[in-house]
Amino acid sequence: MKQLYGVIGNPIGHSLSPVMHNDAFEHLNMDAHYHAFLVKEEVLGEAVRGLKALGISGFNVTTPHKVAIMDYLDEIDPLAKQIGAVNTVVHKNGKLTGYNTDGIGFVRALQSISSEPLQEKRILLLGAGGASRAIYFSLADAGVKEIDVANRTVDKAKELIAACTATVHSVALSLEKATKEQGSYDIIIQTTTIGMHPRVEHTPLQISSLKKGTIVSDIIYNPFETKILCEAKEQGAIIQNGIDMFVYQGALAFEMWTGCVPNIERMKQLVIRKLGG
């Protein structure tokens, strides 16, 4: 019998997840299908109960349901609970269990371009919203010991740092201070929407004085190279856009559902083609 998977969100028509997962199922000769479900906020509970009753094997959760979904699950993974958001649900033995693969997916993506373990790196996170929280907690869970957080509102950065129970040396900074101290970091991670299409001329931090070998990663993938990535590339940095995070978080969800590891490079090239790259 064909296994059913999917993604719920609103809006959902733009999602690249169906094409990515369905190609992986086909490539691995699996009898499964991944479908995008438009689910409005006021019917989230009914939708989740319906998916469970239909016997869906697993599903992803995107905007605006990543927090609200937690009220309708049987179990929540400890890291997802700490992050306060779920983006992947596994249906097994009659139970719906929630996970967050955004942060772990990002960590795997980052490690894929780093020649050294991330645990030895000094990291600067730009932004203190939901994406930053998922990445901060996942880096801490992976054993990274030095993570500073820069945000327009410094108090929000302080709140993020205070919420983490892992042993991490962290300082909350203004964006101005982070700009001055950028040369002291091994990795800079941009987690805000600043620089996203159509406001491509904006950047949260002017890149001017990076040290050699710095990695600059931006979770945005429209455009492929944001202003911060263009400036970092000019400085000789190793750069990474948000496609890697998207692919790795999806691959991790696929692995959780099926027990099979999909071809990451195949997924990545497919997404790039679909985005017009």
UniProtKB/Swiss-Prot annotation:
Homodimer. It is an enzyme of class 1 (oxidoreductase). The keyword Amino-acid biosynthesis applies. This is Shikimate dehydrogenase (NADP(+)). Keywords: Amino-acid biosynthesis, Aromatic amino acid biosynthesis, NADP, Oxidoreductase. Belongs to the shikimate dehydrogenase family. It catalyses: shikimate + NADP(+) = 3-dehydroshikimate + NADPH + H(+). Pathway: Metabolic intermediate biosynthesis; chorismate biosynthesis; chorismate from D-erythrose 4-phosphate and phosphoenolpyruvate: step 4/7. One of its GO terms (biological process) is aromatic amino acid family biosynthetic process. CDD domains: NAD_bind_Shikimate_DH. The gene is aroE. Shikimate binds at residues 15-17, 62, 87, 102, 221. GO terms for cellular component: cytosol. Coiled coil: none annotated. InterPro entries: Aminoacid_DH-like_N_sf (IPR046346), NAD(P)-bd_dom_sf (IPR036291), SDH_C (IPR041121), Shikimate_DH (IPR011342), Shikimate_DH-bd_N (IPR013708), Shikimate_DH_fam (IPR022893), Shikm_DH/Glu-tRNA_Rdtase (IPR006151). Its EC number is 1.1.1.25. The lineage of its organism: Bacteria, Bacillati, Bacillota, Bacilli, Bacillales. The active site is at residue 66. GO terms for molecular function: NADP binding; shikimate 3-dehydrogenase (NADP+) activity. Gene3D superfamilies: Leucine Dehydrogenase, chain A, domain 1 (3.40.50.10860), NAD(P)-binding Rossmann-like Domain (3.40.50.720).
